[in-house]
Amino acid sequence: MSNTDLEELRRGTDLVKRGFAKMQKGGVIMDVVTREQARIAEDAGAVAVMHLESVPADIRKRGGVARMADPGGLEDVIDEVSIPVMGKARIGHTAEAQILEATGADMIDESEVLTQADDRYHIDKREFTAPFVCGARNLGEALRRIDEGAAMIRTKGEAGTGDVNQAVTHQRNIQRSIRKLSGMDYEERDEWAREHGAPRELVHETAEMGRLPVVNFAAGGIATPADAALMMQLGCDGIFVGSGIFGAENPQAMGEAVVAAVNNYDDPETLKEIAKSPGKGMKGQANETLPEEEKLQDRGI
């Protein structure tokens, strides 16, 4: 076997990484801190869980530096559930991502929810076997992350607020740009790529597909079944829910309701019944009241 073949086996290929991400399509991925929360999430119907030290709402309250969670906690969650387990690394923090991969994370989120480690560069995700998910506010950001090796994109939204406004804004930004690209000729797409700092090959691929070349989930401020249904109606492939589950009055009921809403997002009668079931949601904070320095979505390039 040649050295090239061995190298290909050692690292997950783009095809394998994107294939794993596609397996989560149509599902809900829930943030968890403990193995007990992971069990609740799996029982509620989550397709995967995201392990972190604290949910985003608590990270906001606590302040200070937010880092990768203790890998021992990640191991506990992996032992507890049968669904995929993801972990968060700081933007640009290659060593944290290496630790998460070595611990057994099925996917790594290079996340703006944690304190940014590098102001200029993101992790080179092509050097990892584990697939990555990254946040984006617009199509240029999304395509730059995909070029670095991301297998999944999510809206950044404004995590920990319970306000879906920014997730909606980011998804509409991405969809609007894709529609615009699809109506351009080849030279115009090249010009768009230069203006937005996006890889031209990915720009052309996106225009021809009429969507991102990888799965695109909603995240950031999704707090209710109705929020989840809205994001699916806007063309998302699935949903990340952070503080909205375990910040709710009844996490099990809220988790089940969000999963049901994603499965029935285009059926208002069923959504009406689902919306009655989960009890009181998390206490939110409107995005427009946040000071600029507290907005997590601005982290990254």
UniProtKB/Swiss-Prot annotation:
For this protein, the record's CDD domains field holds: pdxS
In this protein, the active site sits at 88
Which Gene3D superfamilies does the protein's record reference? Aldolase class I (3.20.20.70)
| InterPro entries (alphabetical) | Aldolase_TIM (IPR013785), PdxS/SNZ (IPR001852), PdxS/SNZ_N (IPR033755), RibuloseP-bd_barrel (IPR011060)
Q: Which residues bind D-ribose 5-phosphate?
A: 31, 160, 221, 242-243
Q: List the disulfide bonds.
A: none
PROSITE patterns assigned: PDXS_SNZ_1 (PS01235), PDXS_SNZ_2 (PS51129)
Binding residues annotated for D-glyceraldehyde 3-phosphate, in chain numbering: 172
Compositional bias annotation for Basic and acidic residues? 292-301
The protein's enzyme class? lyase
Q: How would you summarize the oligomeric state and partners of this protein?
A: In the presence of PdxT, forms a dodecamer of heterodimers.
Name the chain's protein: Pyridoxal 5'-phosphate synthase subunit PdxS
Organism of derivation: Natronomonas pharaonis (strain ATCC 35678 / DSM 2160 / CIP 103997 / JCM 8858 / NBRC 14720 / NCIMB 2260 / Gabara) (Halobacterium pharaonis)
Record lineage = Archaea, Methanobacteriati, Methanobacteriota, Stenosarchaea group, Halobacteria
